[in-house]
Amino acid sequence: MLGASGVQIGTRFLVAEECDIPASYKERVIKASDIDAVVTGRSTGHPVRCLRNQLTRSLQKIEKEGGSEEEFNKLGVGALRRAAIEGDMQTGSVLAGQIAGMITKEQTTEEIIQELMLGVKEKLNLQVNGINA
């Protein structure tokens, strides 16, 4: 069977009831659209995917205009803390993957894992049925 050998699902678990981040962070992920996840930091060799906000627009402008790494880093210092601890959704680094636009509600970790396992079972059944056809 060909396909993925693993999954990376951090964004989904950010919105788990058990995740201890500010409600504003969870809300931002839930309200994200399919085009809100952007990458910054390519010019520094440290790309990061976050949800679009005032910080990402400023960082992207620096990169587009060929600003220095020092200028870039000055804006980024403490940005994750501002988002994940202080709940600042404008000048904080709201880390999230491309999947953010598909997350619509807060769930328990158990519910998330059950949904994932159901998806795996469905895919495996399709593979087995395809082989037996």
PLM features per residue range, with description:
Residues 1-133:
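Conserved active-site-proximal phosphate/metal-binding subdomains
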